[in-house]
Every structure is written in structure tokens, then in C-alpha cells.
Swiss-Prot record:
Species the sequence originates in: Halorhodospira halophila (strain DSM 244 / SL1) (Ectothiorhodospira halophila (strain DSM 244 / SL1))
Family note: Belongs to the Fmt family.
Domain of life of the organism encoding this protein: Bacteria
UniProt cross-references to PANTHER family, sorted A to Z: METHIONYL-TRNA FORMYLTRANSFERASE (PTHR11138), METHIONYL-TRNA FORMYLTRANSFERASE, MITOCHONDRIAL (PTHR11138:SF5)
GO MF: methionyl-tRNA formyltransferase activity
Known catalytic reactions: L-methionyl-tRNA(fMet) + (6R)-10-formyltetrahydrofolate = N-formyl-L-methionyl-tRNA(fMet) + (6S)-5,6,7,8-tetrahydrofolate + H(+)
GO cellular component terms attached to this protein's record: cytosol
Phosphoprotein is among the record's keywords: no
Pfam families: Formyl_trans_C (PF02911), Formyl_trans_N (PF00551)
Function description: Attaches a formyl group to the free amino group of methionyl-tRNA(fMet). The formyl group appears to play a dual role in the initiator identity of N-formylmethionyl-tRNA by promoting its recognition by IF2 and preventing the misappropriation of this tRNA by the elongation apparatus.
Keywords in alphabetical order: Protein biosynthesis, Transferase
Matches recorded under InterPro entries: Fmt, Formyl_trans_C, Formyl_transf_N, Formyl_transf_N_sf, Formyl_transferase-like_C_sf, GART_AS, Met-tRNA-FMT_C, Met-tRNA-FMT_N
Binding positions ((6S)-5,6,7,8-tetrahydrofolate): S110, L111, L112, P113
Identification of the protein by name: Methionyl-tRNA formyltransferase
Length: 310
């Protein structure tokens, strides 16, 4: 396919889209991604995943702090037919949106207009949504407000985590992009305006939202654990030890349970009494320690029913 494509993306979610374009014979004339950032315990300067993927494919990489007037002219000089944007991390302004012949299209990890914004995967899990999907959208200057080109739905399973859903939606998005690219470049798709009904926003999760509140119902806490797994993990003070809860399930409680205490411990996990039912923790990571099963954790620490959890 002899098309001049500019690709813009940054995290792991965007890599399958870039890979799919190259595998389909569409080598972007340029890749834009965020600058290298300090990461990890040593705060070493680390390239974003899209940069590593682009270099693996031998593609030219640009890493501006923002897409300003100078960058818009750089893109214009590339004479692109289309700009493909996947989790780039910036809202594009009109001076960029108007440059490509067929504009800019975005791969978004929700069924728009539900969950516009930065954290659609986590918000869908927190809300207990039964399905989500990917929307291919013609970009405008708003926050995920542009008209839709295509959508693909997928169910959310009962044990879905943010990690597993992220990987599946990234693959769905890549396939959706490649499947509809010929129509987009032929001007053969009529964009469909997003409906006014059903609009919700997916703000980034705050630090406070990572804490589990044992006074909430167990089902709600389980959703929070899954929405924060595997990274960064839901936080909890288990007795005297702060931990990250990586896997848990809601189960039935007992009349004598006191919310915010350890209800039971055993080979299956650590059961915490909540506002409604119990939360059985099966995998966790203590502060400064390694990820482990609850059984392994109990082998090295004494935890008894009645201890406080907060």
C-alpha cells in the first residue's frame, strides 16, 4: 500500500498498531513519540515502548516535548496522507490535525462515547462494565470527541484485569486499524458523529483511588483490585504491613464479621471482612518484597483473624 503514514504513539498499547502497519506493508514515514523519561528505582532515562518498536523496524523517530508550530511544519514537509494516533499522550491542535490529506485517526480503548479520556480500561473495570471495545475515530480538537469510523466490541470476563484487557484491546485496535485503512485512504468511510447520550469520562486514577477501603462491598473491592492489576496494584494495610493486592475475589461473609479486620487465613488466601461479604486475597506484594501467593506470604508472617485491615 503506497501511502504516506505518520504514526504517533507512546506506551505498550500503541506497539501492536505500529507493528501491524509494518506487517501490512505500510511503513510510516515518521514516528512521533514522547521523550525518554526517568523510570525504575534508579530513575534511568528510559525510551518509550513505541521508540523501541520503531527502531526495531528501522523507522525514523521524533520525540518533541509537544507538537507545536515547528513540529507541525516538520509533519507538513513529510506530505502525509494520514496520521495514525494511538495513546500518544497529547491532544493534537488544529495546526497538526489539518496537515494530513485524510486527517488524523485515533485508536481509542473504549466504545465511544463511553469512557473518553486517559484511563478507559481501568474505568470500565471499576464500573463493572460487561463489555468494552475499541473505537477508530477521526480526530478533532476535543478530548476523544471526533466522529467514529469503526468500532469493535468485546466482553469483559469476570476475572478480567487491566493487564489482560489492555493486551486484548491493543490487538483488537491494531486489527481494526489495518482492516479499515484502505477505506480511510480511499475516502470511502463516512464518519458517524458520536451520540450525545452515554458520554462518560475516564480520568486517570488518583493515588487515593489505589487504596482499598474495607468498609466498601467486597464485589466493589474486587473490581478495584482487577482495575489496578498488575500495575500498580491496589493498596492495603494488612495488620502492620502495607501490601499491594494483585489478585482477589469476593466471597460470602458471616454474621459475626467485622468490616476492616482479617476474617480468616488459610491455604487458599487471606479473607478480609468488608462492608458486604469478604474479600479473599490470593496474590500480593508486601512493601519492599516480591510478588507472591497469599499462602507463601503466610509462611513468613503471622497473621491471625481479628487483626485490623485498612
Amino acid at each position: 500500500m503506497a501511502a504516506r503514514i505518520v504514526f504517533a504513539g507512546t506506551p505498550d498499547f500503541a506497539v501492536p498498531g505500529l507493528d501491524a502497519l509494518v506487517e501490512a506493508g505500510v511503513r510510516p514515514v515518521a514516528v512521533f513519540t514522547q521523550p525518554d523519561r526517568p523510570a525504575g528505582r534508579g530513575r534511568r532515562l528510559t525510551p518509550p515502548p513505541v521508540k523501541r518498536a520503531a527502531e526495531r523496524h528501522g523507522l525514523g523517530v521524533h520525540q518533541p516535548e509537544r507538537l507545536g508550530a515547528e513540529e507541525a511544519e516538520q509533519i507538513r514537509a513529510l506530505a502525509p496522507d494520514l496520521m495514525v494516533v494511538v495513546a500518544y499522550g497529547q491532544i493534537l491542535r488544529r495546526n497538526v490535525l489539518d496537515v494530513p490529506r485524510f486527517g488524523c485517526v485515533n485508536v481509542h480503548a473504549s466504545l465511544l462515547p463511553r469512557w473518553r479520556g486517559a484511563a478507559p480500561i481501568q474505568r470500565a473495570l471499576l464500573a463493572g462494565d460487561e463489555q468494552t471495545g475499541v473505537t477508530l475515530m477521526q480526530m478533532d480538537e476535543g478530548l476523544d470527541t471526533g466522529p467514529m469510523l469503526a468500532r469493535k466490541a468485546t466482553p469483559i470476563s469476570a476475572d478480567e484485569t487491566a493487564g489482560s484487557l489492555h493486551d486484548r484491546l491493543a490487538r483488537i485496535g491494531a486489527d481494526l486499524l489495518v482492516a479499515h485503512l484502505p477505506e480511510i485512504l480511499a475516502g470511502a468511510i463516512t464518519p458517524e458523529p458520536q451520540p450525545d447520550d452515554g458520554v462518560t469520562y475516564a480520568a486517570k486514577l488518583t493515588n487515593d483511588e489505589s487504596w482499598l477501603d474495607p468498609t466498601e462491598p467486597a464485589e466493589q473491592l474486587e473490581r478495584r483490585v482487577r482495575a489496578l492489576a498488575p500495575v500498580p496494584g491496589a493498596r492495603l494495610q494488612l495488620g502492620e504491613t502495607p501490601v499491594r493486592v494483585l489478585a482477589a475475589r469476593a466471597c460470602a461473609g458471616r454474621p459475626e464479621d467485622r468490616a476492616g479486620t482479617v476474617a480468616a487465613v488459610g491455604s487458599g488466601g487471606i479473607e478480609v471482612a468488608t462492608g458486604e461479604g469478604r474479600l479473599e486475597i490470593t496474590r500480593l506484594k508486601p512493601a519492599g518484597g516480591r510478588e507472591q501467593t497469599a499462602a507463601d506470604y503466610l509462611n513468613g508472617r503471622r497473621l491471625v483473624p481479628g487483626e485490623p485491615v485498612q
